[in-house]
Amino acid sequence: LQEALKDFEKRTGETMIQWSQFKGPPNPNVEYIPFDEMKNVMVVMNGVMFPINGPGTPRPLNRPNLQQNEEKNHHPDE
């Protein structure tokens, strides 16, 4: 990635913005949560806990085509 940025700077003469410029001081109002604890997020629906992105979470094999969904949900005007 660094090589690509350097190549871009050579070709265009423009300097790409470094990600470190976006990183500000940590917000004291936000509690830090380690990444390992974020791996297994649980959501409670109707009193039942569902893992969101933990192991054993079913993954969709393919996303339904948006156009097909529109055709299924289309109600003809009467």
UniProtKB/Swiss-Prot annotation:
Gene of this entry: PPP4R2
* Similarity field: Belongs to the PPP4R2 family.
**Species this chain originates from:** Oryctolagus cuniculus
Kindly state which keywords UniProt assigns to this record, in alphabetical order: Cytoplasm, Cytoskeleton, mRNA processing, mRNA splicing, Nucleus
Q: Subcellular location, in the record's words? A: Cytoplasm, Cytoskeleton, Microtubule organizing center, Centrosome; Nucleus
Known function:
Regulatory subunit of serine/threonine-protein phosphatase 4 (PP4). May regulate the activity of PPP4C at centrosomal microtubule organizing centers. Its interaction with the SMN complex leads to enhance the temporal localization of snRNPs, suggesting a role of PPP4C in maturation of spliceosomal snRNPs. The PPP4C-PPP4R2-PPP4R3A PP4 complex specifically dephosphorylates H2AX phosphorylated on 'Ser-140' (gamma-H2AX) generated during DNA replication and required for DNA double strand break repair. Mediates RPA2 dephosphorylation by recruiting PPP4C to RPA2 in a DNA damage-dependent manner.
- Which protein is depicted? Serine/threonine-protein phosphatase 4 regulatory subunit 2
Which stretches are annotated as coiled coil? none
User: What are its GO cellular component terms?
Assistant: centrosome; cytoplasm; nucleus; protein phosphatase 4 complex
